[in-house]
């Protein structure tokens, strides 16, 4: 049986789009913002020898630095002013969300502060972003100077200017993402990552086809990879839309001589409640300690290069850490975005109940029981999708990063943006009805 949202979406007339002025403005703003972002990934950092940098990057792009480059939309390979990308913001968000439950002041702001509390927490996230971006930018500047011939005029001036430029680029992307969210279409931060991945796919595909022409990859292997990508995309779409629906009943009420209520509804629980957040968080934590390793060839960097090698694509340590972090963040983020006790209290206030389950605490325990088991399935699904391509890439040496994380981001962002697009279109089509309600 179709959900209410699906029934409403089926009634949307896309012919109404030509009259949806507000929606058109949001789409144009989003496209313009993404264009500005892409232009920024081609503006090189001042004082860099691009040719030497390109040679070093081509020798090391098969490692985890390739993942970093993917999230930055190719800016790392060009050492552009937006090379840090939005990853410091994501890392800061992880840290803030981890400390909110254990810091009484932050926990109070989240639960009781309302809109003002949410803004205050967001401000702390921005401060953390600037702090982390400064550390990472300084590390990159030092690493670039350690690589022979990359920096034209090494020294303190280069380090300071590089830090200011890279941190400014991250702040700009953070602001741009917020503007897309408020004035555009979709979630701004997610769309920036999405745009970076999509922009790099044509070059990656072209490189793979070139290897096929040169005989480095067999035609059968390339065809098999195409079918594998299609199968994974289909599987991801199915799993992202999968949900467990708990039946909710409402008792009948007699008002005068008429009976009201008695309707049945359902409480949808997504199979993957955490969405694409766990793989992104896991990737950002694995990237954070080694953002400069592949650019540094100076003395004293042996241990850092060893860590980088152990965290390379297909390495056992990398895959174990990646899987463990994905599972952890699945449970952690699910606990943040869905509170069984609050849901049970809301059902009780509305007079609803799950058949066979007492309202209140027992309902919360039952919902938590179901949600925990759904999270097991969801976490297993995310681990399989993220690690299977990694294993195949390391096994068959496919020369570009097209892992499960990128597939998950593409599918989730596309679905979320389309859902928001349908919501705006529906609101425009039934504007009069919405005003009355």
Describe the predicted segments one by one.
Residues 2-437:
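N-terminal cationic and glycine-rich segments that engage phosphates or anionic surfaces
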